[in-house]
């Protein structure tokens, strides 16, 4: 196979429908936000964590406007990379900020993988050794890698099926949890006992990570049907769906667990919240939904981030070596993305991964808005 072919990108135009694109976006968003971040945010801001989710939603809604306007004008598989290129040209700021987004997305992918392991191990009484969580996360990434190799139709079909089951299951959990608890309640702390405003802002920043999955939609621009219309619509639908689901489930968790219990079970707080509300069957149901949600998130994240890196390489913003691998550059970046995700999943814990990811994302997000304003 020629070197030229090795360094060529191949996109399946018109292979993603609007519902399929929405499912890819919500796959990342719902997987990270509900199952991985609820306990982390509660630890930072106390009983006010559902309000931190809402504050993050407001900020992201304003932020999404810039992405929608740019994606309508420049739909591309490069997504963020292409937008930065339009704003800053073929210069260092474009490559630097695009790579921050790339690493942020890979970190989110690893975050989801370890969350998958944490929930799965609750079926077996937890992971006292600490070994099985990363092993299960690594296995999930490898399965998602194989599915991504098999083409967009399969990715869309799997993501859509998982998305429908996941959203239905989470809504059932939220509604039943609130119904059994008898009310939607938060124990608002006294001002003297409330967390510092800085803690609430920190939790809100972490909550933004729960919504940033909408940016993965922008990386599908070359493959979405009628991209100038459907990318913006998919972003709006994804954010609206996540606001509804996050709010509902946040209040359900707060109504069934004390703050101390949420923090103690922060890596699997939804499963813990299901026990008092629904018993052991509810725990198993919630774990199954969590496994589907995080698996769908991994699938969508790998799909989006590998395409963005391929576009950056095509624009000659980052160097590329194919190391003798056959196929298009898109397949090569898929391999590199998976290898990096495997390393992060195996050696970093949830809190470190989340903190690093949000810093990278926020720096890149500021650059996007500054570029639009220029």
Label every PLM stretch briefly.
Residues 194, 324-331, 365-374:
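C-terminal membrane-solvent junction of multi-pass transporters and transport-like membrane proteins
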Residues 82-90, 122-126, 236-299, 317-350:
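TM-loop-TM module centered on a large, flexible mid-protein loop between adjacent transmembrane helices
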Residues 22-23, 49-54, 95, 134-139, ...:
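Hydrophobic alpha-helical transmembrane segments
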Residues 40-43, 52, 62-141, 145-149, ...:
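Hydrophobic transmembrane alpha-helices that form the core helical bundles
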